[in-house]
Amino acid sequence: MSPVTTESPATVPYVEHIGMTRQYWRDIILGINDGLVSMLLLVAGVVGGGLDADQVLLTGVAGAIAGAVSMAAGEYLATKSQDEVLTAELDLERTHIIHYRELEVAQIREMLTAMGVRADELEVVANALTRDDEILLNAMKALEFGVVDSERRSPYKAMVMSGLLFLGGSLSSVLPFVFVDDTTIGLLWAGGITAIGLFGVGMVKAVVTRSNHFVSGSENLLIAGLGGVVAWWVGKMIGVGLT
């Protein structure tokens, strides 16, 4: 009788997590996309208004700086406010654990059951998570509020990323007017570079999300581009109404 052989299943290659940047990808995508789209619309508007290349360049530089500062300040305040709300909620949760411990223990049992912990395992798991107030607080922080300390966003990092990436995105619409005197040619260059930039941002996102590069790039280009077209059209309609 020949020996029975078993083939081991194909090994899935181990892929590292992206690390501490993952909670800031919102700021990365928003900052650079906003810089790409909003600055192109600004440049298109002033070119349509008849400004020469030097005036367009000056307007673009001023708009890029103002937009970056506004984006950075807004993101700092928004992130800090969200973190303050969360801190206040966790302080209240600590008070609940001290004064209404039985209710919190019952709540964590309900959450464990909802997660699929079997009845015969529930007592062991619940006792492990409730044997100490600090352990219970950490468990409630993760299960009730969905918070892990390592994933909390720094307002300063969010501010810097949003502001700098907005500034970086705006360069695609500003730099062409450093090298050309014809505003129409400059605008065409700005539009082309912006489109490439939007597609590139989507492709970079696909590397992180491990999704299809072309689909992600096209999605970012189409959605951001459509938003830009809508904004331009609304502005044009308002302008027609005023004249």
Located regions from the model:
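Juxtamembrane helix-loop transition segments at the membrane interface in multi-pass membrane proteins
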Residues: 77-91, 204-218
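Cytosol/matrix-facing amphipathic helices and coiled-coil assembly/linker segments
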Residues: 2-20, 24-26, 80-163
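Transmembrane alpha-helical segments of integral membrane proteins
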Residues: 172, 192-211
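Small-residue-rich segments of transmembrane alpha-helices in multi-pass membrane proteins
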Residues: 219-232
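Internal alpha-helical transmembrane segments
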Residues: 2-78
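Juxtamembrane boundary at the C-terminal end of a transmembrane helix
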Residues: 232-243
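Hydrophobic alpha-helical transmembrane segments
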Residues: 28, 56-61, 159-163, 187-192, ...
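Core segments of transmembrane alpha-helices
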Residues: 35-40, 162-173
